[in-house]
């Protein structure tokens, strides 16, 4: 179910403060955040945001096509290693 339009997008206030500070100081270091639930706003375009995936912070460069999506969509949490190979001896 989608979010109601009258509520507006959700962004953690501490993330907005960090982004505004990075824009004001023209800092190129990634903005580190644990807030995967925050929505990407147009102010984030051109910044690198380091999103936590449960193990490490994944750098995500924000483009205009990402606006409206959540930050967690761009930092995958699960790694698929592939199914194990069949270890049975093959007959010739």
Swiss-Prot record:
GO terms for molecular function: rRNA binding; structural constituent of ribosome. One of its GO terms (cellular component) is cytoplasm. The keyword RNA-binding applies. Transmembrane segments: none annotated. Keywords: Ribonucleoprotein, Ribosomal protein, RNA-binding, rRNA-binding. Belongs to the universal ribosomal protein uS19 family. PANTHER family: RIBOSOMAL PROTEIN S19P FAMILY MEMBER, SMALL RIBOSOMAL SUBUNIT PROTEIN US19M. This is Small ribosomal subunit protein uS19. It comes from Acidovorax ebreus (strain TPSY).
């Amino acid at each position: 179910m989608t979010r109601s339009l009258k509520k507006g997008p959700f962004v953690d206030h501490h993330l907005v403060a960090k982004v505004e500070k990075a824009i004001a100081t023209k800092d190129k270091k990634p903005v580190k955040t644990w807030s995967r639930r925050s929505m990407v706003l147009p102010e984030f375009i051109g910044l690198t945001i380091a999103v936590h995936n449960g193990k490490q912070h994944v750098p995500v460069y924000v483009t205009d096509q990402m606006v409206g999506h959540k930050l967690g969509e761009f930092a995958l949490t699960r790694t698929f290693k592939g199914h194990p190979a069949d270890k049975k001896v093959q007959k010739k």
